[in-house]
Amino acid sequence: MPKYKCQNVTNFQRSIISASCSLLVINLDTNRNYYQAMPTYTGISGEAFRHPLDRQAEQTLRSVPGFDLLASKFIEFLYERPQLIYHTGNSIQVGPRQYATIYRLFRESVRDLDVFPEPVLFVTQNPIANSYALGQEKPYIVLNSGILDLLNESEIRAVLAHELGHIKCGHTILIQMAMWAMSVVSAISEMTFGLGGLISSGLIYAFFEWRRKAELSSDRATLLVTDDIDTVISTMMKISGGSHAYAHEVSMPEFIRQSEDYRELDKDNLNQVYKFLLYNGSGSPTSMLSHPFPVDRLHYIRDWAGSEEYRQIRLGNYKRAGASGAVDVEVEEPTNPPPKPESEPDRLRRQIEDLQAEVDRMKRKG
């Protein structure tokens, strides 16, 4: 049998079955030498763990007048490529020889969620503990350096899984569209580029409502990858108000109690109004919140962690994606039948319309 020298092998891949019948993929690449286990959730579709409020809010968004035209304009202006170029020139691209530990955590998460193609990962200099995922044809993830300084390895992996969840669920195209629309609204007082009268306040509210609900789906991806609700909780807690110096003085049980207290506030209808106003600000895109409050997210993910749906996914019973891996969300009208009266989409649409009418009334009065 001929002998092969590894240093002479380029892009050479083999598949072997061990005695224990566990399948490993050996990727002997001159640039990346590692043993890669098969994905934890092989072929999983983002729809398998997508939160129903995410689906409903997207349905509402797509039904708001002006969405289709905005989508066509977004594609025309190609928002995706400039952002990728920016980070290629202004951030550090993570790889086997650049932030090797972070890359290992990233590869594990990519494997577990069976994301293909592998997104590009960047670290950018920013002390705020934040991250985001963008791109459809060439997806990428950006971690602020503050994430690396605040979190431990398990928690960094949780953040990476969260962003991969956005990619897996097909959120990134809508996120980019929202960012582009908001930048147009913020930069141009008199709409140009054929967008005059297009980006209504109702459409803006619908974008932000969907954006917040999309986070709930990605939190589920975090739990699937970490398989540890405590890691998810500690990550949320640290991003909410973590500290290196006083890390020993924070308590997860107290954070959970705070989450429960926050939910109790809804018993007073006036508190619900205040929450709505806090999320939506004055109606300006710069004052609206893109994420749910961490204690609210904590409630939803703890609820799912004890669900039968989560248990079945862990057992391997879940919806599979196509050959491409991640599920893309195309820019088109939904094919699902219209919801029944008083469904969640109807409620959101009614709130958006009422709020837009009030904003218009105040503008006329002013």
Q: What residues fall within each predicted segment?
A:
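Short pre-active-site segment immediately N-terminal to the catalytic Zn-binding motif
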Residues: 143-158
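Substrate-binding clefts and substrate-entry loops adjacent to catalytic sites
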Residues: 192-209
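Hydrophobic or amphipathic, alpha-helical segments that drive membrane association/targeting
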Residues: 21-137, 243, 311, 319-366
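Active-site-proximal gating segments in proteases and membrane effectors
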Residues: 66, 123-131, 203, 223-327, ...
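Active-site His/Glu-centered metal-binding helix of metallohydrolases
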Residues: 151, 160-169, 217, 221
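An active-site-proximal "capping" alpha-helix that borders the catalytic cofactor pocket
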Residues: 106-109, 211-232
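Catalytic Zn2+-binding segment of zinc metalloproteases
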Residues: 164-183
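Short, basic, low-complexity termini and linkers enriched in Ser/Thr/Gly/Pro
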Residues: 1-30
